[in-house]
Amino acid sequence: MKFQLQHKTIFLRQLGIQPYEPISDAMHLFTEQRDTNTPDEIWLVQHPKVFTQGQAGKAEHLLSLGDIPVIQSDRGGQVTYHGPGQQVMYVMIDIKRARIGVRQLVTAIEDTVIKTLAHFGVKAYARPDAPGVYVNEAKICSLGLRIRKGCSFHGLALNIAMDLEPFQRINPCGYAGMKMIQLSDLVPGITVEQVQPVLVEKFCQQLGFKLNS
């Protein structure tokens, strides 16, 4: 019983605004060094302006980058944009230990965001043909994962109160003309700080974790 309780605990790390590459490096190091007894973790972070190109990324989806850097990432998916006012949540879960599949984890993350948005009175949905979460046919949350040694890393990026213009410089997630939306378009005045605790709570509820911050 003690063993089970230990592994249903998840640790939360509040990282503020941090450059993409050091966080990516730390995430890789955490995943490489973890073993079967390592507790799972959630990392909440915002990144300065950056485009990240996923494993499936193609150069033709980079349209007019301007002065925003492009960084290659080993997450799934194509190109996306990160910037202040967007909540990124990285999920380091031992899915083998948790006995969940990758598709189950993706669905749990999408449902987490859908329920978080519902908390603020916004109706959102997932699409079977394009991972992520959508509101009125516009994308509000991007999702990209990597699995290594039976453990997940990378995660989601939820648009809350940010400058959406850089999304026009790319084909978001490889879809030309994909319309992007943010929560503040629907709930004026909403902040990242208001959304964070709800997002974490809904994620823990979805997968049965007890939070240890």
From Swiss-Prot:
| Residues covered by the BPL/LPL catalytic domain | 36-211
Q: Where does substrate bind?
A: R75, G76, G77, Q78, V79, T80, Y81, H82, S142, L143, G144, G155, L156, A157
Task: Give the catalytic activity.
Answer: octanoyl-[ACP] + L-lysyl-[protein] = N(6)-octanoyl-L-lysyl-[protein] + holo-[ACP] + H(+)
Enzyme Commission code(s) on record: 2.3.1.181
Lineage top rank: taxon: Bacteria
Query: Which GO molecular function entries does the Swiss-Prot or TrEMBL record give?
Result: lipoyl(octanoyl) transferase activity
Pathway assignment reads: Protein modification; protein lipoylation via endogenous pathway; protein N(6)-(lipoyl)lysine from octanoyl-[acyl-carrier-protein]: step 1/2
* Site location (Lowers pKa of active site Cys): K139
Among the record's GO biological process terms, what is one?
protein modification process
Active-site residues, Swiss-Prot/TrEMBL: C173
Determine if S-adenosyl-L-methionine is one of this entry's keywords: no
User: Primary place of residence?
Assistant: cytoplasm
User: What cellular component terms from Gene Ontology apply here?
Assistant: cytoplasm
Which keywords annotate this record? Acyltransferase, Cytoplasm, Transferase
Location of this chain's protein in the cell: Cytoplasm
Which InterPro entries does the UniProt entry name for this protein?
aa-tRNA-synth_II/BPL/LPL, BPL_LPL_catalytic, Octanoyltransferase, Octanoyltransferase_CS
The entry's family comment says:
Belongs to the LipB family.
Relay the record's extra comment.
In the reaction, the free carboxyl group of octanoic acid is attached via an amide linkage to the epsilon-amino group of a specific lysine residue of lipoyl domains of lipoate-dependent enzymes.
Function of the molecule? Catalyzes the transfer of endogenously produced octanoic acid from octanoyl-acyl-carrier-protein onto the lipoyl domains of lipoate-dependent enzymes. Lipoyl-ACP can also act as a substrate although octanoyl-ACP is likely to be the physiological substrate.
Q: What is this protein called?
A: Octanoyltransferase
The protein's organism comes out as Photorhabdus laumondii subsp. laumondii (strain DSM 15139 / CIP 105565 / TT01)
